[in-house]
């Protein structure tokens, strides 16, 4: 059964419009809208961020630029896997998404895509991604990919997200998994440097996502999601943001000696953006503690810049 449901196009008199002229234009527009809806289910911006960490990890593992074929396979497989996880997340969370203002325009709550079709789409993407990596890389990379999809959707989305304030922490492993997958695809094993990069992305997710939860606190509360900023005190939220921000920066610096020959090309930019990241984290928490108006999305965006610079430095250092 096709995942794309065609809608009849009629003229004002109620008669069917021919496949040419205005009817054909309308059909093309409908098709583009359907395709756009399926793409939206994959959350492309999240996919992009995951790939930012995957390629540098592969380059560090290889000690330079891996073969273009291997990079293409991992990028395609990784994109499909991340897309699959997001689609299945949208399917499981469709009851929540229709309650939250931030998400009610997503394809499922907006009824642009039928839930059954979204489920099939997500399962197909997951199957293709794992198969691709199993055939063209190795069992470890494929196994990690499958584990990440299952953990994200069945453990985090369906269970932990709805039941514990530590949901962001326990879900962090999924966001950091692409680092391990990329490394494993190159070497077939996981070195200490791979785990260090994993740690950077893992710890980074708390000071990245807590500000987002602060901004949409009322939205999460309306949906009954126990995000830490929704149910905990300002003091508790501030403490976790600062602890994990410091852990992120410290682990990124520990990665310097653990990396295979990484030098100041990695270390200096990482140190500079780490200081800025910590300054922004402390600024947000200080204002929140004083009861002043805060701009949590400032830290959210800075954290994205921080991670991008760190992994760009990993890639550049591996090349030189």
UniProtKB/Swiss-Prot annotation:
It catalyses: heme b + (2E,6E)-farnesyl diphosphate + H2O = Fe(II)-heme o + diphosphate. Pathway: Porphyrin-containing compound metabolism; heme O biosynthesis; heme O from protoheme: step 1/1. GO terms for cellular component: plasma membrane. Its EC number is 2.5.1.141. It is found in: Cell membrane. Coiled coil: none annotated. Keywords: Cell membrane, Heme biosynthesis, Membrane, Transferase, Transmembrane, Transmembrane helix. InterPro entries: Protohaem_IX_farnesylTrfase, UbiA_prenyltransferase, UbiA_sf. It is an enzyme of class 2 (transferase). One of its GO terms (molecular function) is protoheme IX farnesyltransferase activity. GO terms for biological process: heme O biosynthetic process. The chain crosses the membrane at residues 33-55, 68-88, 117-137, 140-160, 183-203, 241-261, 262-282, 300-320. Its main location: membrane. It is a multi-pass membrane protein. Gene3D superfamilies: UbiA prenyltransferase. Residues 1-24 are annotated as: Disordered. Carbon 2 of the heme B porphyrin ring is defined according to the Fischer nomenclature. Converts heme B (protoheme IX) to heme O by substitution of the vinyl group on carbon 2 of heme B porphyrin ring with a hydroxyethyl farnesyl side group. Belongs to the UbiA prenyltransferase family. Protoheme IX farnesyltransferase subfamily. This is Protoheme IX farnesyltransferase. It comes from Salinispora tropica (strain ATCC BAA-916 / DSM 44818 / JCM 13857 / NBRC 105044 / CNB-440).
């Amino acid at each position: 059964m096709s995942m794309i449901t065609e809608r009849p196009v009629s003229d004002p008199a109620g008669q069917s419009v021919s496949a040419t002229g205005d009817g054909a234009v309308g059909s093309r527009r409908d098709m583009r809208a359907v395709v756009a809806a399926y793409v939206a289910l994959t959350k492309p911006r999240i996919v992009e961020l995951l790939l930012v960490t995957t390629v540098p990890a592969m380059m560090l593992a290889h000690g330079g630029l891996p073969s273009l074929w291997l990079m293409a396979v991992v990028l395609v497989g990784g994109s499909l896997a991340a897309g699959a996880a997001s689609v299945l997340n949208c399917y499981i969370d469709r009851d929540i998404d229709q309650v939250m203002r931030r998400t009610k325009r997503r394809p499922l709550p907006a009824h642009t895509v039928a839930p059954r079709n979204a489920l099939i789409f997500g399962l197909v993407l997951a199957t293709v991604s794992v198969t691709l990596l199993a055939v063209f890389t190795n069992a470890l990379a494929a196994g990690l990919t499958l584990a990440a999809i299952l953990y994200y959707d069945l453990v985090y989305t369906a269970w932990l997200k709805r039941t514990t304030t530590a949901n962001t922490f326990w879900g962090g492993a999924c966001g950091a998994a692409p680092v391990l997958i990329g490394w494993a695809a190159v070497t077939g094993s996981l070195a200490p440097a791979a785990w260090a990069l994993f740690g950077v992305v893992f710890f980074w997710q708390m000071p990245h996502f807590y500000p987002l939860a602060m901004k949409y606190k009322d939205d999460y509360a309306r949906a009954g999601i126990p995000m830490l900023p929704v149910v905990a005190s300002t003091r508790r939220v501030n403490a976790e943001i600062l602890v994990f921000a410091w852990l992120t920066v410290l682990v990124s610096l520990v990665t310097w000696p653990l990396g295979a020959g990484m030098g100041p090309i990695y270390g200096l930019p990482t140190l500079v953006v780490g200081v800025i990241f910590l300054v922004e984290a402390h600024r947000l928490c200080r204002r929140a503690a004083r009861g002043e108006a805060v701009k949590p999305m400032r830290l959210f965006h800075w954290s994205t810049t921080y991670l991008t610079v760190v992994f760009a430095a990993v890639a550049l250092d591996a090349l030189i």
